[in-house]
């Protein structure tokens, strides 16, 4: 029963919550196609590569491969790739082929393929999500899609995209709306992604099931890395099979009921296949996850082996692949990422000190419930310091709750577990997001935004007037991406401001020294506020959007907050002190 494999922490609702449609197609049509892209450094084809259809005299830098299988016999099929302006950059015909044992491409069962070389390619990344237009034409049908030229791999325990180390600034996201539940509209998806972009988030884990297909297409367009997760979670239902459900017995037989039970292998593999087949052509998907909190054993081993055989072009992930009994050993060769939830910093350091062969990913960290998330800067210090840390996904994006009208004073009312009279529920444990159910940001999201800012001050020599700023982007020149200005604050009041000129390139993960020698007031507590703003419009963000800031103390002869000193010189022993700021009122009696 699939119910045992769907124990995700969320409101569980019934009914049809995604679009269902019927599609009429020609009998002789392309049944399925798979698109992969790879980069060829230096202009030479990789060893063992199939013949390449070249696009003019331009040097080969990227290759797009399209594989297909037909419904009722092959028909002439033309594949064309055009750039954003509509100019055709490569074209060719699907031809029969037989995959060899050393075939590095995607899929099983494909009978035809074409390889197209693209000279001087515009590569896809979350920082620059450039998409080409793919057209597949048969006598009775035209299929269109969008393609991002990119390559993801692990070398030296470092995740790389297009040859450069990759950092995932991600969140775990459920489909959840206070009014419509898991039925999510297109504008709802755009709103989520816009909020994420505004807060320097570049990655999404589809926890814990495949999302609406349109969501992945938006991630392609707007620039997000996606870990696409299979609909597979059994962490609570495992114990239902145990006659003795005591904790000691659960530990002893932690994975036997489902994860290490061959009777569940077909169901587990099927869910993995459904996830991969549907999103195999999405450039935003850089990793497949076999599920969440299902324990580990023969079922997950089989699912992950299938993924690596079918799609060696992406990474594989599964967090619950540890074992309770030290006598047992399982197959981890099909897992590319070492994944942990909520580890202590020391656990991360111990792993990195062990000379690992897999990158470390925080698949869930900094639980955002209540006054969380906490320790964000501590985690990001170690992420920034070691390329083998490829980032992580904060748990989680939004609070889960059900809209229940408004209170007498007009505020929205949301219900959570137990408010409906149900006997079995999670209480408020699904109210654990960075935003409210109706997408109002919580304070923790503002902190996350600044921790993940694209640049930061690493040194300021006040005597020499030299400010050193590091570019924390993975693929983009900071001078192209951001404008930098500063303000001098005296007791919190701006007394001077100026733009800083980025006249030289600042490549990813490098630093630049800028002249910054403002006049510092002789009295008061003073700070240098360095502000990063978006240099030009992006699909979801307007130019001048504030990306983050640094605040650096400034020395002067006094250093005391004069406003506090003035209050001390004129104490008030009666009445009330009222502080107002941007509509927020605090009364101190």
Question: How would you name each of these model-derived features?
Answer:
Residues 1-218, 222-226, 271-272, 286-287, ...:
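Secreted/periplasmic carbohydrate-active enzymes, especially glycoside hydrolases
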Residues 193-196, 203-434:
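Substrate-binding/catalytic cleft of secreted carbohydrate-active enzymes
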């Amino acid at each position: 029963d699939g119910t045992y494999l769907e124990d995700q922490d969320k409101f569980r609702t019934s009914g049809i919550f995604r679009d269902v449609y019927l599609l009429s197609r020609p009998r002789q049509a392309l049944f399925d196609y798979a698109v992969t892209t790879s980069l060829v450094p230096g202009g030479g084809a990789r060893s063992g590569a199939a013949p390449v259809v070249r696009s003019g005299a331009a040097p080969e830098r990227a290759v797009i491969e399209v594989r297909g299988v037909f419904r009722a016999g092959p028909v002439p099929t033309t594949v064309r790739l055009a750039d954003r302006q509509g100019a055709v950059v490569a074209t060719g015909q699907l031809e029969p082929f037989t995959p060899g044992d050393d075939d590095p491409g995607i899929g099983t069962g494909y009978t035809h393929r074409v390889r197209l070389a693209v000279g001087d390619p515009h590569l896809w990344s979350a920082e620059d999500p450039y998409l080409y237009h793919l057209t597949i034409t048969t006598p009775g049908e035209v299929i269109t899609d969008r393609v991002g030229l990119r390559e993801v791999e692990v070398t030296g325990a470092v995740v790389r995209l297009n040859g450069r180390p990759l950092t995932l600034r991600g969140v775990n996201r459920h489909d959840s709306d206070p009014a419509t539940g898991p039925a999510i509209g297109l504008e709802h998806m755009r709103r989520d992604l816009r909020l994420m972009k505004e807060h320097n988030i570049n990655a999404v884990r589809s926890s814990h099931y495949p999302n609406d297909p349109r969501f992945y297409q938006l991630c392609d367009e707007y620039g997000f890395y996606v870990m696409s997760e299979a609909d597979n979670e059994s962490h609570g239902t495992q114990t239902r099979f145990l006659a003795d459900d005591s904790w000691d017995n659960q530990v002893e037989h932690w994975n036997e009921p489902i994860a290490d039970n061959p009777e569940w292998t077909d169901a587990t593999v099927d869910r993995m296949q459904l996830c991969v087949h549907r999103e195999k052509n999405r450039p935003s998907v850089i990793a497949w996850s076999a599920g969440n909190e299902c324990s580990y054993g023969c079922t997950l081993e089989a699912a992950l082996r299938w993924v690596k055989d079918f799609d060696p072009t992406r990474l594989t992930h599964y967090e619950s692949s540890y074992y309770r009994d030290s006598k047992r050993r399982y197959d981890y060769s099909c897992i590319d990422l070492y994944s942990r939830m909520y580890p202590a910093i020391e656990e991360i350091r111990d792993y990195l000190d062990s000379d690992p062969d897999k990158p470390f990913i925080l698949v869930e960290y900094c639980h955002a419930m209540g006054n969380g998330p906490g320790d964000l800067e501590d985690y990001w210090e170690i992420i920034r310091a070691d390329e083998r840390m490829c980032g992580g996904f904060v748990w989680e994006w939004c609070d889960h709750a059900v809209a229940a009208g408004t209170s007498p004073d007009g505020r929205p009312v949301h219900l959570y577990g137990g408010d409906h009279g149900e006997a079995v529920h999670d209480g408020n444990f699904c109210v654990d997001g960075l935003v409210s159910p109706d997408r109002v940001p919580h304070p923790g999201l503002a902190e996350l935004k600044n921790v993940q800012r694209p640049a930061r001050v690493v040194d300021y020599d006040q005597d020499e007037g030299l400010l050193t700023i590091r570019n924390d982007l993975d693929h983009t020149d900071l001078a192209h991406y951001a404008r930098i200005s500063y303000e001098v604050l005296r007791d919190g009041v701006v007394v001077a401001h100026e733009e800083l000129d980025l006249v030289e390139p600042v490549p990813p993960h490098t630093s630049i020294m800028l002249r910054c020698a403002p006049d510092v007031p002789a009295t008061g507590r003073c700070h240098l506020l360095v502000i990063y703003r978006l240099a030009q419009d992006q699909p979801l963000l307007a130019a001048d959007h504030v990306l983050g800031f640094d605040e650096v103390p400034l020395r002067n002869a006094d250093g005391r907050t004069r406003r506090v000193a003035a209050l001390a010189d004129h104490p008030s022993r009666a009445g009330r002190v009222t502080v107002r700021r941007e509509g927020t009122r605090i009364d101190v009696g």
